[in-house]
């Protein structure tokens, strides 16, 4: 089958969406499918090796903020999108932003089957403005996503049952399929002795970008209230704009957290 995957984020593996998209593409190709990709450019000539590139959106004075948050949104290019879509049997679109919205309209015009995924919660958007707890704002974003993007698709991939429930409660009538994003085969259950310095500790591992919605701050703030606070050792694997803040919170703990972006083998 010829499949076109359209995703804004497809660069450094520093966020869950990028990791999920790359895993999807690699596994589809392993199963014999011909996969083309449309994403923000990285210098690769558009159309080479099935990779169609478009420019990133220029946020002007906010570019540094956007970069720190690991958010790269692609600028729609109708010519490139049509080239990437025209020979496909089905198109899978990851994000409900300008590139994805342009793509679903082109697919509707060209009568190409479309599947989508729900990887961006409205709270992920509103948190950048400190409004993640505003029901009115988040409800509006759910409606905006539905009207401008998801209404064009009959199928939505939901990574968790929680996401599926949220969509149903906000009026999404599509076929919602819950499929886990999965775990890299490198991570398998096994027992191994703890390093000596952690032998008597309750070790807690958190893996996520250092951003508000991942709630690492709440984890660190909660530890002093635990009965065994002096026995808890937290490992926070990732990167992001809140790293300095997490380190400041960690300094107050008896066992400061180990914070960084370790290689997969170490993780």
Language-model features: locations:
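Nucleotide-activated donor-binding/catalytic signature segment of Leloir-type glycosyltransferases, i.e.
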Residues: 244-266
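Conserved donor-binding/catalytic core segment of Leloir-type glycosyltransferases
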Residues: 4, 195-225, 234-235
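Acidic anion/phosphate-binding donor-loop and adjacent secondary structure
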Residues: 183-200
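Carbohydrate-associated surface elements
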Residues: 41, 162, 182
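Membrane-proximal helix-turn-helix segments that form the acceptor-binding/catalytic region
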Residues: 109, 137-155
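N-terminal subdomain of nucleotide-sugar transferases
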Residues: 1-45, 49, 55, 86
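Active-site proximal beta-strand in glycosyltransferases
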Residues: 3, 90, 107-127, 157
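Short N-terminal targeting/anchoring amphipathic segment
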Residues: 81-100, 112-115
């Amino acid at each position: 089958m010829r499949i076109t995957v359209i995703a804004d984020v497809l660069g450094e593996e520093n966020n869950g969406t990028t990791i999920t998209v790359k895993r999807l593409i690699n596994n589809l190709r392993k199963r014999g499918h011909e996969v083309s990709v449309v994403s923000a450019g990285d210098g690769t000539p558009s159309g080479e090796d099935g990779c169609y590139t478009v420019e990133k959106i220029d946020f002007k004075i906010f570019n540094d903020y956007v970069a720190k948050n690991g958010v790269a949104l692609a600028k729609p290019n109708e010519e490139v999108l049509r080239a990437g879509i025209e020979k496909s049997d089905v198109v899978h679109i990851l994000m409900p932003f300008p590139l994805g919205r342009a793509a679903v309209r082109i697919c509707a015009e060209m009568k190409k089957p479309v599947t989508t995924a729900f990887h961006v919660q409205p709270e992920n958007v509103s948190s950048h403005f400190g409004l993640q707890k505003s029901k009115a704002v988040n409800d509006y974003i759910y409606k905006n996503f539905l009207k401008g993007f998801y209404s064009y698709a009959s199928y939505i991939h939901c990574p968790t049952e929680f996401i599926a429930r949220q969509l149903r409660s906000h009026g999404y009538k599509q076929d919602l399929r819950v499929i886990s994003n999965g775990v890299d085969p490198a991570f398998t259950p096994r027992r191994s002795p703890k390093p000596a310095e952690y032998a008597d500790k309750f070790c807690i591992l958190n893996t996520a970008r250092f951003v508000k919605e991942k709630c690492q701050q709440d984890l660190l703030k909660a530890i002093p209230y635990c009965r065994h606070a002096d026995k808890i050792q937290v490992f926070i694997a990732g990167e992001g704009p809140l790293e300095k803040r997490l380190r400041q919170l960690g300094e107050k703990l008896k066992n400061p957290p180990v914070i960084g972006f370790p290689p997969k083998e170490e993780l």
